[in-house]
């Protein structure tokens, strides 16, 4: 009985809301943060991407569409990123362009903690979940049954390269 009550107690990390400070605008600096899904001192961070590629703010609270889930090294929106790429799961029809593949989402169906992120993508009737590790992240995509499913890997920048090798269940590449 005593052991189970220890696990039910909240830990300090449970009080962290990664969405705080994400209502960023050029006209008024309101935090300029992004909801990092990462371990302390992790090699990279992951975040949902609501902004267009190349924008300083990859995630801001106001938009209602997610364009992908971005791997980032960006410490602040005021400092440019490097080695970045985004992945976007989808169903129905493969869409490569970042505007056409974006999916509507609601903050009511979004859960953000430093150690777990989940969101329902209504355009594709599916859920994406992310859990960080020291060097990467685990993703779980819950696709609807009897639907074609895709995952787009977008390396963003010129000079980047992505190759899918289906027979080896492998994706290789690099970004600049």
Describe these PLM feature segments.
Residues 1-10:
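Bacterial Sec-dependent N-terminal signal peptides
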Residues 9-176:
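Accessory carbohydrate-recognition regions in carbohydrate-active enzymes
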């Amino acid at each position: 009985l005593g052991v189970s009550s220890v696990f039910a107690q909240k830990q300090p990390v449970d009080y962290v809301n990664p969405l705080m400070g994400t209502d960023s605008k050029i006209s008024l600096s309101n935090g300029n943060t992004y909801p990092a899904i990462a371990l302390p001192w992790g090699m990279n961070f992951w975040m949902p991407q609501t902004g267009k590629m190349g924008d300083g703010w990859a995630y801001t609270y106001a938009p209602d569409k997610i364009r992908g889930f971005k791997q980032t090294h960006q410490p602040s929106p005021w400092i440019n990123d490097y080695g970045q790429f985004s992945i976007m799961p989808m169903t129905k029809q493969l869409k490569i362009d970042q505007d056409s593949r974006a999916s509507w989402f609601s903050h009511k169906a979004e859960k953000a903690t430093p150690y777990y992120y989940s969101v329902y993508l209504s355009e594709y009737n599916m859920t994406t979940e992310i859990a960080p590790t020291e060097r990467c992240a685990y993703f779980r995509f819950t696709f609807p049954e009897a639907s074609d499913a895709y995952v787009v890997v977008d390396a963003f920048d010129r000079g980047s390269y992505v190759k899918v090798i289906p027979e080896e269940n492998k994706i290789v590449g690099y970004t600049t």
